[in-house]
Amino acid sequence: VNARRITPAAYLEELKARGIPALRVGRSAVMLESPLPVKDIPGFSEGIVSVQDAGTQLAAEILAPQKNEQILDACAAPGGKTAHLLESADCHVTALEIDPKRAELIKSTLLRLRVEATVRAADAAMVSEWHSGREFDAILLDAPCTASGIVRRQPDVPWSRRPEDPARLAREQERLLNALWPLVKK
């Protein structure tokens, strides 16, 4: 639920009035008892709500952004975590995505939700190409991984992986962490 637009309690009332059973999950989420196509979820196209896994939503809650903080969301596409950070506090987020098409996806997500961030298509590890020199209060890095955590939703994931993927992805994660760690305020 986009906290800048509606409370979870008010959204639950709206769903109830439409005959859509749902329940509150955590501090800011609502779960429909039966799935609906995204286009049929009340308020989705208007930016009132987003669709996210419960685990994904925890990223913003754990980071707990504060007013005026500078936050970097690296490897940010499709923009759900970026948006959730911005919905949680009046903070400033820089969202990086290496793929320009996926960076555009972040922009469209933020536009739909009526929140603003600085979105850049850049390799997060190539700091000199995108960084202004300002330190960040926090960094959210959802580094490329084997996607083993989404097998429940996408059972074909194990079949699309190669034996060398874990080692290759671990090197990429290390490269990103080593590049970004120095940008956090001491």
Predicted features along the sequence, with ranges:
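S-adenosylmethionine
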Residues: 1-186
